[in-house]
Structure formats: structure tokens, C-alpha cells
Amino acid sequence: MRGGMGNMQKMMKQMQKMQKDMQKAQEELAEKVLEGTAGGGMVTVKVNGQKEVIDVIIKEEVVDPEDVEMLQDLVLAATNDALKKVDEVTNETMGKFTKGMNMPGLF
């Protein structure tokens, strides 16, 4: 019976280590800055790992008072591009912790 208890303690230590490693990875992700672009780099949106927009850069030559809708579309596309990159990096980083576990939609 003693062997079963030792295995349980070992498993608990592994779980605690994994939890600590996951927390560290999440903190590192939060500090990452990813960029999305649109219009051949005319609009750039920077987003942190928590999906907060931290900067929007619009090149002057794309600003046309006669075509505000195009600029809106470019900002939207660049933002979605940046958010997609955050999702990709998050899945890549956190996926190593959930590999082999059946936990759909966790990250």
C-alpha cells in the first residue's frame, strides 16, 4: 500500500511543477508583443499576449478623407491579424502542457 501513496505524492509534485510552469508561460505570453499588418504594411496593430491593443500605426499616405471606409477596413484587418497571431503563439506555448490530454477549448 505504501507504493501507491508514494506514486500519489510523486504525481502531486509533478502537477504542482506543471502548474508553476504554466503560470510562468502565461506571464511570459502576457509580455509578448505581436504585430498584425494590412495594406502592405500601411496599417500596423500591436497587441500584447493578453489580446490588448497597445499601438496602432497608420502611415500618412493611407489616410484619405474621401475613403475613410478603406482605412477602417485596414485597421480591422490588421487587428484581426494580430489577434490571430496571439492565438497561434498561445496555442503553441500552452499546447506543450496539454499534449496528450483531451481538454478541448482549454486555451
From Swiss-Prot:
Biased segments, Basic and acidic residues type: 18-27
Cited function: Binds to DNA and alters its conformation. May be involved in regulation of gene expression, nucleoid organization and DNA protection.
Location relative to the cell: Cytoplasm, Nucleoid
HAMAP family, A to Z: DNA_YbaB_EbfC
PANTHER family the record matches: NUCLEOID-ASSOCIATED PROTEIN YBAB (PTHR33449:SF1)
Species whose genome carries this gene: Bacillus licheniformis (strain ATCC 14580 / DSM 13 / JCM 2505 / CCUG 7422 / NBRC 12200 / NCIMB 9375 / NCTC 10341 / NRRL NRS-1264 / Gibson 46)
Protein name in UniProt: Nucleoid-associated protein BLi00029/BL02358
Upper classification of the organism: Bacteria, Bacillati, Bacillota, Bacilli, Bacillales
Keyword Cytoplasm: yes
Family membership: Belongs to the YbaB/EbfC family.
Domain of life: Bacteria
GO molecular function: DNA binding
Region annotation (Disordered) ranges: 1-27
Keywords: Cytoplasm, DNA-binding
